[in-house]
Amino acid sequence: MALTKAEMAEHLFEKLGINKRDAKDLVELFFEEIKGALESGEQVKLSGFGNFDLRDKNERPGRNPKTGEDIPIKARRVVTFRPGQKLKSRVENSEPVDQ
């Protein structure tokens, strides 16, 4: 199961008592701020949670798995996430969930 933006907004509505529209707008604004910072080349640091970083990957050789043909994989910029120590500890110490 995955946590969705709609579920985040519902949790804000339930825990903070703000109306559902404001909760939805707050969640959207939060993610828009992260996207905007990353688009402008900034690192995003969320204390106690982790960091979103940008990495530039060089062009490299690849292979089409269907045909075996060699093809170049273009240089690109990717987003990486590194969890913070607090998040790592909480996840490591949590009980496994059966799927």
Swiss-Prot record:
The UniProt entry's GO CC annotations, sorted and at most eight, read:
cytosol
Checking InterPro entries in the record gives: Hist_DNA-bd, Histone-like_DNA-bd_CS, IHF-like_DNA-bd_dom_sf, IHF_alpha
Name any one GO molecular function. DNA binding
Coiled coil regions, renumbered to chain: none
Q: Which Pfam families match?
A: Bac_DNA_binding
Instruction: Report the SUPFAM superfamilies cross-referenced here.
Output: IHF-like DNA-binding proteins
Q: Is Transcription regulation among this UniProt entry's keywords? A: yes
Write down the Gene3D superfamilies for this protein, in alphabetical order.
IHF-like DNA-binding proteins
Q: Which GO terms describe its biological process?
A: DNA recombination; positive regulation of metabolic process; regulation of DNA-templated transcription; regulation of translation
Q: Which UniProt keywords apply?
A: DNA recombination, DNA-binding, Transcription, Transcription regulation, Translation regulation
Family stated for the protein in its record: Belongs to the bacterial histone-like protein family.
The protein's role, per its UniProt record: This protein is one of the two subunits of integration host factor, a specific DNA-binding protein that functions in genetic recombination as well as in transcriptional and translational control.
Q: How does it assemble?
A: Heterodimer of an alpha and a beta chain.
What this protein is called in its record is: Integration host factor subunit alpha
